[in-house]
UniProtKB/Swiss-Prot annotation:
Source species, domain of life: Archaea
NCBIfam families per the UniProt record, alphabetical: PRK03922.1 (NF003035)
Pfam families associated with the record: DUF555 (PF04475)
Source organism: Methanosarcina barkeri (strain Fusaro / DSM 804)
Disulfide links within the chain: none
Family stated for the protein in its record: Belongs to the UPF0212 family.
Name recorded for this polypeptide: UPF0212 protein Mbar_A2902
Membrane-crossing segments per the record: none
Length: 129
């Protein structure tokens, strides 16, 4: 059995906001309320999008008519999964139960091994064998 770090992405709709910072705060707060305290092992952050012109990354927040669409990233570690695909299904199931009606997309799955020394982990990409 292997251990995996799974990163999922979701689009979060926030109404009645004027600034990107407000939208980010509300989106993270709402997602956190749905996840906690049961799923305190899930990390929530704002995703990034690359500018199509210059390639510079910026926060995934888009506002129109005081309504924002915020790209959120959810990260969790899945232990003792049979494969990367199995870890994806576990993460989507665990997080998806709390975030009903919010579609989740897998961004990245990385295998890691528990180290014998405390706090250290060795990471291996999904594509490495």
């Amino acid at each position: 059995m292997k251990n995996f770090h799974v990163v999922l992405e979701a689009a979060w709709l926030v109404r009645d906001v004027k600034t990107a910072d407000d939208a980010i705060g509300v989106a993270i707060s709402e997602a956190g309320k749905r996840l906690n305290p049961k799923l305190d092992f899930v990390e929530v952050d704002v995703g990034t999008t690359s500018c199509p012109l210059c390639g510079e990354p910026f926060s995934s927040v888009f506002i129109a008519a005081n309504t924002a669409l915020v790209g959120l990233i959810f990260e969790m570690k899945v232990f003792d999964a049979e494969s990367a695909e199995h870890a994806e299904r576990i993460a989507k199931s665990v997080i998806g139960k709390s975030l009903r009606d919010i579609p989740l997309t897998v961004v990245e799955v990385t295998e890691f091994e528990r180290s014998t020394e405390k706090g250290e982990q060795q990471h291996k990409s999904k594509t490495e064998k």
